[in-house]
Amino acid sequence: MQIVRNVPDLRAARAALTDGGRARLALVPTMGALHEGHLSLVRAAREAGHVVAASIFVNPTQFGPNEDFTRYPRDPERDCALLAEAGCALAWLPEVSTMYPPGDATSVEVAGLSVVLEGAVRPGHYRGVATVVVKLLGQVRPDAAYFGEKDWQQVQVIRRVAADLFLPVEIVVGPTLREKDGLAMSSRNRYLDPADRARAPLLHQVLRRVRAALRDGEPAAAALAAGRRALAEGGFIVDYLELVDAGTLAPLTAPDDGARLLAAARLGTTRLLDTVAV
């Protein structure tokens, strides 16, 4: 696996790996601290016939002033070893000064999708996400980009960006991978202390309960309220638990074919996200 840290080397590596554009290239964007969920995206891209590139960049513009940018786990040597083992051909590790050089003045804002749910709790978060993803897509120029289902709102924001800006890239979503107890895999799970780690699977359990209640015909408002209450009783501070349209993220009063439950809640200082299709 090639590891590149500047744009000229990236362009040269891309040209060589794709045989001048004759082979299809996939990008798996990450912030490092890789887990099996990330690696499953690499393997899925390979199985689809792509040469695979992965980026490792902890993007400062998607963190709020009181969030965990400085303590976000960083171990690029470990991450690169895992990527190579999974069959990744190219690792792109840019510096902040490469992604945001002096004079950088452009950002990408997605109206509507960026200001609800996670965007309401973390103002400006999706501006940072959308901007860095557009930069990465412009640098790597992949035919496809792979993202995880767990960050469902992020996927919809990126799909909207790609459609609105006519970006020639296919957005592919890989399923959420879970620990044996149901907790969605996440780089931030390592922040959980033993007591909170034991409580953490409740988030997915509650989503499944709410889904079952909705399928049994319970009114959405009652099912969601019961879910929020169960999380609070289990030690979570709930940011949101909502039933939404999977594409528009508009709130729903009853499930339909495109319905999805999205949740974010905190245990101690750790925020956990999860989602299930209804």
From Swiss-Prot:
Q: Which residues bind ATP?
A: 31-38, 148-151, 177, 185-188
A biological process (GO) annotation for this entry? Answer: pantothenate biosynthetic process
Single GO MF descriptor = pantoate-beta-alanine ligase activity
The catalytic activity of this protein is classed by the Enzyme Commission as 6.3.2.1
For this protein, the record's InterPro entries field holds: Pantoate_ligase, Pantoate_ligase_C, Rossmann-like_a/b/a_fold
This protein's pathway: Cofactor biosynthesis; (R)-pantothenate biosynthesis; (R)-pantothenate from (R)-pantoate and beta-alanine: step 1/1
- Identify which top EC class this enzyme belongs to: ligase
Which reaction(s) does its UniProt entry say it catalyses? (R)-pantoate + beta-alanine + ATP = (R)-pantothenate + AMP + diphosphate + H(+)
- Keywords annotated in UniProt: ATP-binding, Cytoplasm, Ligase, Nucleotide-binding, Pantothenate biosynthesis
The record's listing under Pfam families reads:
Pantoate_ligase
Xref: SUPFAM superfamilies: Nucleotidylyl transferase (SSF52374)
Instruction: Quote the subcellular location field of this record.
Output: Cytoplasm
Chief localization: cytoplasm
List positions binding (R)-pantoate: 62, 154
Q: Does the keyword Magnesium apply?
A: no
Would you name any one GO CC term? Answer: cytosol
Name the catalytic site residues. 38 (proton donor)
Q: Which residues bind beta-alanine?
A: 62
Q: What does the record's miscellaneous section state?
A: The reaction proceeds by a bi uni uni bi ping pong mechanism.
HAMAP family the record matches: PanC (MF_00158)
Q: What does this protein do?
A: Catalyzes the condensation of pantoate with beta-alanine in an ATP-dependent reaction via a pantoyl-adenylate intermediate.
Subunit structure as annotated in this protein's UniProt entry: Homodimer.
**Family, per entry:** Belongs to the pantothenate synthetase family.
Query: What is the protein name stated in its UniProt record?
Result: Pantothenate synthetase
